[in-house]
Structures are given as C-alpha cells and as structure tokens.
Amino acid sequence: MAGSPLDALRDLPLADRAVALSWLGQAGFALRTGGTGGTGGAGGTTALIDPFLSPWDGRLYESALPAARAEGVDLVLVTHEHIDHFDAASAPAIAAASPEAVFVVPAPIVGMVAESGIAPDRVVGVQPGDDIELAGLRIRPVPAMHGVTMADAYGFGRELSGGLVRFLGFVLDAGGVRVYHAGDTIHFDGMEATLRDLEVDVGLLPINGRDPEREARGIVGNLSEREAAWLAREVAFDLLIPMHYDLFARNRGYPSHVVDSVDRDHPGVPVFVPPREHPFELGARR
C-alpha cells in the first residue's frame, strides 16, 4: 500500500524549529513540528486540524488519508461541528489508530465529540482567551464568526451555547512559526487587531466566500478571496495559504483570485497555494 500523507509528512527532513504542513483538502491540515517528543516516530509533535476523511456524497475527491492509518497523531484540533471540520464518522478510527491523541474542540461541542466514540478524558474543550500547551504545541483559540445554520449565522454561536463561543480558529506556536488556522469565518470587528496582537506569521484562510444563492441553500459562507487578501495585508502575515475552496462543486473558491487581488490591491502579501497531500516546510520566523 502506498504511503499516506502522514507518512510523507514524517519522512520530510525538518529542522528543529521548523514546521511541516500538508494540506488534506478543504480545511484539513496535518502539521508536524521539528525537534523531539511526540508519538509519531519522527520527533516533534504531529497534529491534525479539521480532518474530513470520510466518504461523503458530493465530494469532488476522496481523502488520501484513511482514518485507520492516522497513526502517531498527538493532537486533533476541531474548529466547529460541521461535517467537513468535525467528521464524527472518522474520529473514532483516528482515536483508535493514535491512542495517545487528544482532541481539542470548542467547549460547547465536547459532548458531541465524546458521543461520537471518543473517550471523554481525551477531549479538551477550549474557548477564546485560553492559552494551553499540549504535546509540546502551544494553542490559543480565537473566535470565528460563522453559524450552525443560516438561522443563526453570522455570529459566534453564543445564543446556542449558553454564552460560550461555538466557532473557533486556532493560533499555534509550532516550532519557530506561529500559524493561524481560521476555521470557517467571515470578518468581524476586532479580528485583525486580535491576530496582530498574537503576532501571527502564517494564515490559513478560507476563501470560498458567500452569496445569496448559496445562503438560500443553507450554506453558511466564509471570507471571499478578496477579503482573505485584505486580511493578510492588514495583519501583515508573512505568508497567506488559501484553504476551503475545492471539495464541493457548488461551494468553491479560486486561489487564483486571491493572487489577482494581492497583485492588484495588496502588493507584497506572499501567497502560497500548496498541492494537496504534499508536505512543505516553513522555516523558523521567531
């Protein structure tokens, strides 16, 4: 059997303070830090972020990472409960393949994650303002503005969750690189100030946007290509990596439009569009 994206990630030579990423499609990423520690056999910490690995009607391609082969994973980070971010069907198989893995999720969905078959003591609920370290990875949750359905969009989900924030992004100190995974979000007041204060180096931003036609079909939208380029400039990311644009035919975005927007309106913003499931290294920035 051919190697999985996690195998390729672990095989990539990595400096002590560098980080390697592999885009799994949609909002899914695998991440490995350099150095020692972790359970994956290659040193450092291995994390999955929003892994959507199950077959699903309407997917334009299948995942190249079977959940049962998600071995050596230390952390699974989940930004919110939508199927393409929290894949309840594959979560138990990931947990079985990586028995040391801890699931880090928004506090309002801890019960949902446990009910999928994850032992409760392996599920950590978090909120914006928390600052935790697990498996050598510093994790700082930040709010995301989204919705479970269009009926509650666009907000932070507090009204559904007893005042708690239901939709998150994560700022990760991965070696010498500070990475922001936005989850699903649109722009909101204070967003760029929060990210500037956290001194984010690399932004993983959704770019599929939103419009009345998709919203009428119940699709809660995200940043557009132009908005992602603008945010990257406002925060002064060292690198913008577009995501969440290619898995469903009726909810697409186009990274070429991000590049066009940068070229036209925000020169100087570096953009990298990674191929799926091919690991790449980011050197230390701090």
Give residue ranges: language-model regions:
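Active-site-proximal beta-strand elements of phosphoester/diester hydrolases
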Residues: 20-23, 46-50, 138-144, 178-184, ...
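Active-site environment of divalent metal-dependent phosphoester hydrolases
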Residues: 55-56, 82-86, 110-113, 130-133, ...
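Metal-dependent catalytic neighborhoods of phosphoester/phosphodiester hydrolases
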Residues: 87-97, 112-118, 250-260
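Metallo-beta-lactamase
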Residues: 2-16, 106-177, 261-285
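Cap/insert and terminal regions of metallo-dependent hydrolase folds
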Residues: 102-104, 108, 186-276
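Pre-active-site segment of Zn-dependent metallo-hydrolases
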Residues: 5-9, 14, 30-96, 148-157, ...
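Structural motif
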Residues: 45-47, 74-75, 102, 137, ...
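Divalent metal-coordination and catalytic microenvironments
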Residues: 31, 50, 80, 87, ...
